[in-house]
């Protein structure tokens, strides 16, 4: 039987205030865990959409699913924000967590944020990206940066995309794809 992650919520400082982050931490405390997973919602999104994945996928890796600046329970940025600002806020989060490398699960425009994050930290910060409903061109842009890419073709209303039932048939493939990399 697969272990279940400890689910937590926390706040981390970033250049725009505090980010509210939904977390899954492996039962073993994170020692010898697989590469951490950063879940990036689409524009104006929250980490809540990834709740169904936190427990099962977080059994052997830390997972961080933030509410983007100005969204959910994160502080408002105090200025207009877009993809680059979201990427900078996530970079601040990863620096606070001392994460050098992460895998990414990005939904919608979150794919563009993942690509912006990879451009900000080209030293292999992002190893693999799983995309759900990516904007046109995102997959090719990721490949041009040398990022291994896989698409998780979930359909339906946003609130149904990452329910346990909707992920069911593709869950094993997702675990296998993400689970193949231990931290360097």
What are the functions of these language-model segments?
Residues 100-139:
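Conserved hydrolase catalytic core segment
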Residues 51, 91, 115-119, 172:
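Short, hydrophobic alpha-helix immediately C-terminal to the catalytic nucleophile
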Residues 45, 56, 96, 116, ...:
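Active-site catalytic microenvironments for nucleophilic, acid-base chemistry
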Residues 20, 82-84, 112, 126:
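A structural signal for the main folded, soluble domain(s) of proteins
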Residues 1-37, 58-61, 124-127, 131, ...:
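Alpha/beta-hydrolase fold catalytic core
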